[in-house]
Every structure is written in structure tokens, then in C-alpha cells.
Amino acid sequence: MPIWVKDTRKEYALAPEGLHQAVCVDVVELGLVKTSFGDKHQIEIRWQLDVEDEGAGLRPLVRRRYTLSLNEKAKLRIHLEAWRGRKFTPAELEGFDVETLVGVNCQIQIVHTLSDDGRKWANVESVVPIGKGMTKIRPSETYQRVKDRNKPGGQVDADGEAVPF
């Protein structure tokens, strides 16, 4: 008997275009990722916006992948320096803990783009500090960091055998 599987692509509400106040809610280590420039160690920074999705009543989550590099041409460095409002010092370039970004407010520019298959995406184009006098926002209590979510495996079935997923 066949077991059918099909594409169940779900449509999500896009984060609105424009400049929005946001708070960093997560930094996810992706490990080595195949890119057009070869295998690169990447991270994903995730932000929640200060607006609510009208349909779900949740704050939109946007994300951007970065190669884990502070090279002067690296998008991560460009965005971090803009976000911090200053250049890295030589000492800071020796090592910067990206985990310190969690909980930090900023403003992000969202731009909508179309992919090759015609889907629309909300992309983080730029990151800048919050303006003077702006009230800081906090991550919503419903967001759970990726590293804190239940990991698959580690469970046993009724016979005491390890479940591999």
C-alpha cells in the first residue's frame, strides 16, 4: 500500500516592509553551510518586530544568515558596526561573542524580494541602533531560543529501546 507525501508549503504573513524597531531574540549556529563560495561557517540572527501580525496576534519574526566572519567586507561586520554605531576596535576584532546580541534592540530595514520560484520573502536589508528616546522592547515570552528547545532523540520506547528521532 503506498504512503503518499505531498508539498504542504504553508503561506505565512510577511513582515511589513520598512524600518521597524526590533529586538534580537536568538543567534543560531548553523555550522558549515554549502554556499556558492564553498562551505562557510554560518549563523542566523533572529529578531522580533515591534508590530503585531493582525491575523495571528504575534509579533513577526525575521532572520538573516551570516557567514561567521569579521572580515572588513563581511556582511556580519557591516551590520554589527552599523547596529553598534561604531567600528570594531582591533582588540574587539580578535573575538566578538555574538550571543551578547540576544536582547539588544535595534531598528531593521525590511525589504520584500521575489525568489526564483515566485515566492515573496521579507529580507533584513540593514540594521541600525534604536533612536534616542525610543522605548526598548523585550522578546515576547512565547519565543523559545533554538538552543533551549527539546532536542530529538534521547527517548526510549515501551521496551526500553532508544528511539532514534
Task: Please provide the spans of the model-predicted regions.
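Short beta-rich binding modules
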Residues: 1-165
